[in-house]
């Protein structure tokens, strides 16, 4: 934790040299423990080539001649410098095509999966509503795009009440545009670290993962803070440490029946690029992966839960969470379903491809999220240690059992 979340790594910005250093550090731990390398050229690190266009102006959303600007009325996560779609209103069971502009109801549905290339117009969820001015202060960035992919990532735009009212009054089929000035796209890179603890031949795979990147540093941190480094101790050095600690424990003792793959992904903060690459070009067949557990923000307790308790996104969607709890994990249902955390971490790249994949967390919506104040001093190590330790034997048991997690009827993304 001291190394990953220390100032020396400058906040482990997505796709930066500091992220590469973090991936190399994880690779060194994998090598020390004797894991089988699954990275490039016989090593543990995967170098993922992407292309990214740097924006030179704030994105502007145009609806029926009305213009709304990032940083004023909207907060945009663009998947490309220019995105155009015809307006559709989401409804249960609706089939949304790539390239559509989708208006979500207020509150936004929990089971909506944005297709690649779509333009999603959303009301503000509570976590953004409560800190709207802080979010508006952030510059917009185009998500990196994997090479040789057909569509860009979805573009998600959060609207203030006035902008949302204009969108809601627009007619179905109206053209909606999100556009910004941008430099020509140039190659960029991100890095994953991947190793395997091989199990018995013919058995399945358990994927344990976290993300190693964070927000880097900025010369204009929110709130006028003099601290320019976004250390990301909770988000997600805590999850990376959880995977490293489980890796340390699971490599000792007898070989598991099922293979365990440990993956630390890059560029989660810019659209899940590292995990998307892994899912599109898996080092093990996705059909062999029985379960994916992503570890995200476990460094502080959630005040809604008993002490030293973790929660699982999408707990009610599959048989995995209840089974882990039955085997001793201090694991309960996500107490923040309105935040749609199931869809907001690397697990979702696997879940939408059919893998039973969830995120383990204890994030209680603390105010230090995505600010320079997310530092090691805020980590509750007693909580983190007990909670992670409670996952060890259930994960070990899962890796040695015949239990196969399943999606519950109608709950698969």
Q: How should each PLM-predicted stretch be described?
A:
Residues 1-17, 33, 37-42, 47, ...:
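N-terminal capping segment at the start of a domain
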Residues 248, 367-413:
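His/Asp/Glu-rich mid-to-C-terminal helical/loop segments that flank catalytic regions of hydrolases
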Residues 2-5, 39, 103, 118-122, ...:
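Structural recognition of the beta-strand scaffold that forms the well-ordered cores
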Residues 3, 17-32, 43, 162-166, ...:
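Extracytoplasmic/secreted proteins, especially bacterial periplasmic and envelope-associated proteins
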Residues 10-110, 315:
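Noncatalytic luminal/extracellular "stalk/propeptide" segments of secretory-pathway proteins
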Residues 7-17, 32, 47-49, 75, ...:
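Second-shell loop/turn segments in exported
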Residues 64-96, 138-232, 245-248, 252-257, ...:
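Soluble metallo-hydrolase cores and metallopeptidase-like ectodomains found primarily
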Residues 69, 164, 255, 265-368:
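Metal-dependent peptidase/peptidase-like ectodomains
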């Amino acid at each position: 934790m001291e190394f990953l979340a220390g100032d020396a790594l400058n906040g482990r910005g997505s796709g930066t040299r500091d992220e590469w250093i973090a991936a190399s550090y994880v690779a060194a731990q994998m090598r020390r423990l004797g894991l089988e390398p699954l990275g490039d050229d016989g090593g543990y690190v995967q170098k993922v080539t992407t292309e990214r266009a740097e924006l030179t102006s704030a994105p502007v959303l145009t609806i029926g001649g009305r213009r709304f600007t990032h940083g004023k009325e909207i907060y945009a996560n663009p998947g490309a410098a220019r995105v155009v779609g015809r307006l559709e209103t989401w409804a249960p069971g609706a089939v949304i095509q790539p390239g559509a502009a989708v208006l979500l109801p207020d509150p936004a549905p929990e089971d909506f999966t944005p297709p690649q290339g779509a333009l999603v117009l959303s009301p503000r969820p509570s976590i953004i509503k409560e800190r709207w001015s802080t979010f508006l202060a952030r510059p917009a960035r185009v998500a990196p795009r994997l090479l040789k992919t057909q569509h860009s990532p979805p573009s998600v735009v959060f609207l203030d009440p006035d902008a949302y009212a204009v969108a809601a009054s627009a007619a179905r089929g109206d053209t909606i545009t999100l556009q910004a000035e941008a430099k020509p796209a140039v190659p960029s890179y991100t890095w994953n670290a991947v190793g395997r603890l091989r199990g018995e031949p013919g058995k399945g795979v358990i994927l344990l993962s976290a993300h190693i990147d964070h927000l880097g540093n900025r010369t204009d941190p929110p709130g006028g803070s003099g601290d320019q480094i976004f250390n990301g101790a909770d988000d997600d050095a805590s999850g990376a440490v959880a995977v490293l600690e489980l890796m340390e424990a699971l490599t000792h003792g007898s070989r598991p029946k099922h293979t365990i793959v440990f993956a630390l992904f890059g560029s989660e903060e810019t659209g899940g690029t590292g995990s998307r690459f892994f899912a599109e070009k898996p080092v093990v067949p996705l059909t062999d992966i029985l379960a994916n557990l992503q570890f995200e923000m476990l460094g502080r307790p959630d005040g809604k839960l008993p002490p030293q308790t973790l929660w699982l996104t999408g707990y009610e969607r599959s048989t995995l969470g209840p089974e882990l709890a039955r085997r001793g994990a201090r694991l309960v249902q996500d107490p923040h379903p309105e935040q749609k955390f199931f869809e907001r971490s690397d697990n979702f790249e696997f879940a939408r491809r059919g893998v039973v994949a969830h995120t383990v967390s204890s994030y209680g919506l603390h105010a230090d999220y995505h600010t320079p104040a997310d530092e090691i001093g805020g980590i509750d190590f007693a909580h983190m240690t007990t909670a992670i330790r409670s996952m060890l034997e259930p994960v070990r048991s899962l890796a040695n059992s015949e239990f196969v997690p399943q999606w519950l009827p109608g709950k698969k993304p």
